[in-house]
UniProtKB/Swiss-Prot annotation:
It comes from Thermococcus kodakarensis (strain ATCC BAA-918 / JCM 12380 / KOD1) (Pyrococcus kodakaraensis (strain KOD1)). Residues 19-260 form the tr-type G domain. This is Elongation factor 2. It is found in: Cytoplasm. Transmembrane segments: none annotated. HAMAP family: EF_G_EF_2_A. It comes from the Archaea. GTP binds at residues 28-35, 94-98, 148-151. SMART domains: EFG_C, EFG_IV. The modification Diphthamide is found at H597.
């Protein structure tokens, strides 16, 4: 026990010295060795035994992750490392590299200031590497590079030192190209990684060794020594001469920023409040004496403690018994236990000051992404997720008495993972669960069975489509049921540039805090500034503009109009699927002076029917989600793979050969991708490795659209015939 207590005492001492803290993550493409690297860093820091590390995968502590060998939840661990005679506290957050868990990656990025990007020396920079690096840079997280699996270059590919150098240079060039492309303007050059200064290290996480130029200079170990030891199979000496954790954690301490440095440039970017307010200044300076503010990045369900929220403390000190506000959910809560994580184990502390990663209980109903503070401050920006839910399954409890338990379990899952959408269909009593892909949903359903011991019936997966329009509609009048309120609106397709800016988070969703700034941005993207000034709301990639002049009572009903706009966007006119890329403009209105005659029961149907009728007059179309598929396969199976893709309405985008392996990149509709895993394994005798990414939405071909609309409507218990304009527009 002595060692563990020593460790905790050391961590407590370092927590109060922000210049000695590094909050960092490890991000990579799936199977490039991220979790193995994390475990060996922990072993080096004395958290687990060295022999076990790498085989043990401490951070993959969910039994499902261990079975699948992929990291599903971002766990975090605090450890201590000595660099040039000083101790440093390193808070490590492990993030998943599998695309179906992209939401976890984005949230973890919010809590950290720096990241080790892991790239497999054999495979090089892969699409998912680009995705995680882009997310890191967008959250102002500084990267360093670890080139992994170098042992394979020596043993399997038998490369000469010269060829290896060329490999490394290619990886570094590719990573720097991405940093130049995605880094914030002021860091495009400063954050490039370089071999000379030690912001690049290379090695083998599995065999627990690593090298960097500063380490080679300091110790005299040469690259040739490494090749000889690897070929001789003398792994013990190798680990002693070039210990992974020393090289990598030295790089972390030297090149990644401490919270004092990082918060100065990260807070103005991540937080929309007034930087000169007392909270703003406290966060900029990472001040432990300021008002306590933290952002929740993850909710974990602990068997003993209930919901544990982990997050980053930006200012002040988190203490037991503190009364706090949950800003987004507009509630108060009281903090109960305060602690930190060492792997799956939570260790209680009396207080955790600014600049640290904390684990607290007592924040009932907090979601990942929640801002928690002792004052009512502006929330941190909504987190951007790179993909949106595209696949839905309907779930029913086999046993009726399990229903309350099922509702609770689904609520909990949605809370832990905001990229999972749960909807209860009141009419059929089914629960609809939407996620980012087949694997994402499989994992969640598995948890219902194992953690909640629930027996559920699951429908075959259903694809979530989107509805949109192709041209501008004429002005349409929407009347309230009592005929006392009239709204005159048009709808039109949203230009791609504007839609992209909303998806990328450059234009925030929701009611704009600063409409002028948003209007200016819209004007830069080609919208007429006079029209853009009317911006009222952005909702799921759709926009509501008020282009009226001096209408009486309009302000009083604006909230209701926005709610009605949301209802119309949640269920479009064709098949009650969500709407995307539509701009709704209000041109004129007549509103009853007595608020009794202009309540929700009057306003909602008026605006909803007007929007739906206008959409029917604007060339309504159906969009379907696409997936990008990246397949690594031996050369001889190439034909089988492209046939498999073609049968699924897919197309090949790119093919390149790396050694014996072909990398095939294709795109196909999600609807055609179910069962792809089995089919591709069969077609390639199990030799294909593949990952998928969300590739946005594309228009459904006309010949298929009618048939799909029929199927969706039938499934929802509606009249299966696709509606015509006269069915949706009220007859005048």
């Amino acid at each position: 026990m002595g060692r563990r207590e020593e460790m905790i005492a050391k961590i407590k001492e370092l927590m109060t010295q922000p210049e000695r803290i590094r909050n960092m993550g490890i991000a990579a493409h799936i199977d490039h060795g991220k979790t193995t690297l994390s475990d060996n860093l922990l072993a080096g820091a004395g958290m687990i035994s060295e022999e076990l590390a790498g085989k043990q995968l401490v951070l993959d502590f969910d039994e499902q992750e261990q079975a699948r060998g992929i990291t599903i939840n971002a766990a975090n661990v605090s450890m201590v490392h000595n660099y040039e005679g000083n101790d440093y506290l390193i808070n490590l957050i492990d993030t998943p590299g599998h695309v179906d868990f992209g939401g976890d990656v984005t949230r973890a990025m919010r809590a950290i200031d720096g990241a080790i990007i892991v790239v497999d020396a054999v495979e090089g920079v892969m699409p998912q590497t680009e995705t995680v690096l882009r997310q890191a840079l967008r959250e102002y997280v500084k990267p360093v590079l670890f080139i992994n699996k170098v042992d394979r270059l020596i043993k399997e590919l038998k490369l000469t030192p010269q060829q290896m150098q060329e490999r490394f240079v290619k990886v570094i060039t590719d990573v720097n190209r991405l940093i130049r492309r995605y880094a914030p303007p002021e860091f495009k050059d400063k954050w490039l990684v370089k071999v000379e200064d030690g912001s690049v290290a290379f090695g083998s996480a599995y065999y627990n060794w690593a090298l960097s130029v500063p380490y080679m200079k300091k110790t005299g170990v040469s690259f040739k020594d490494i090749i000889d030891l690897t070929n001789a199979g003398d792994l013990k000496t190798l680990r002693k001469k070039a210990p992974l954790h020393v090289v990598v954690l030295d790089m972390v301490v030297k090149h990644l920023p401490n919270p004092l440095e990082a918060q100065k440039y990260r807070i103005p970017h991540l937080w929309r409040g007034d930087i000169n307010s007392d909270v703003g200044q406290a966060m900029m300076n990472c001040d432990p004496k300021g008002p306590m503010t933290m952002v929740v990045t993850k909710i974990i369900l602990d068997k003993h403690a209930g919901e544990v929220a982990t997050g980053r403390v930006w200012s002040g000190t988190v203490k037991t018994g503190q009364e706090v506000y949950l800003i987004n959910s507009k509630r108060k809560a009281r903090i109960q236990q305060v602690g930190i994580y060492m792997g799956p184990e939570r260790i209680n502390m009396e207080a955790v000051p600014a600049g640290n990663i904390v684990a607290v209980t007592g924040l009932r109903d907090a979601m990942a992404g929640e801002t928690v503070s002792v004052q009512q401050i502006e929330p941190f920006e909504a987190l951007h997720y790179t993909s949106e839910p595209v696949v839905t399954v309907a779930i029913e409890a086999k046993n009726v008495k399990d229903l309350p338990k099922l509702v609770e379990a689904l609520r909990q899952l949605a809370k832990e993972d905001p990229t999972l959408h749960v909807k209860i269909d009141e009419e059929t009593g089914q629960h609809l669960l939407s996620g980012m892909g087949e694997l994402h949903l499989e994992v969640k359903l598995h948890r219902l069975k194992t953690e909640w011991k629930l027996d559920v019936e699951v429908s075959p997966p259903i694809v979530v489509y989107r509805e949109s329009v192709t041209k501008q509609s004429p002005i349409v009048e929407g009347k309230s049921p009592n005929k006392h309120n009239r709204f005159y609106i048009t709808v039109e397709p949203m230009p791609d540039e504007i839609y992209q800016a909303i998806r990328e988070g450059e234009i925030p969703e929701g009611r704009p805090k600063d409409p002028k700034a948003v209007a200016k941005k819209l004007a830069e993207l080609g919208m007429d500034y006079e029209i853009a000034k009317g911006i009222v709301d952005i909702y799921n990639g759709n926009m509501f503009l008020d282009n009226t002049k001096g209408i009486q009572y309009l302000n009083e009903v604006m909230d209701l109009l926005v709610d009605g706009f949301h209802q119309a966007m949640d269920e479009g006119p064709l098949a009650k699927e969500p709407v995307m890329k539509v701009i709704v403009r209000l041109h004129d209105a007549k509103i009853h002076e007595d608020n009794v005659h202009r309540g929700p029961a009057q306003i909602y149907p008026a605006i909803r029917s007007a929007i739906h009728c206008a959409m029917m007059k604007a060339g309504p179309v159906l969009y379907e989600p696409y997936q990008k598929v990246i397949i690594n396969v031996p050369y001889e199976y190439m034909g089988a793979v492209s046939r498999e893709l073609n049968q699924r309405r897919g197309q090949l985008i790119d093919m390149r050969q790396e050694g014996e392996v072909m990398i095939i990149i294709g795109e196909a509709p999600v609807a055609e991708m179910f069962g792809f895993a089995g089919a591709i394994r069969g077609a390639t005798s199990g030799k294909a490795l593949w990952t998928t990414e969300h590739a946005g939405f594309k228009r459904v071909p006309n010949e298929l659209a009618q048939q799909i609309i029929r199927q969706i409507r039938q499934r929802k218990g509606l009249d299966p015939n696709p509606p015509k304009e006269q069915d949706v527009c009220p007859q005048q």
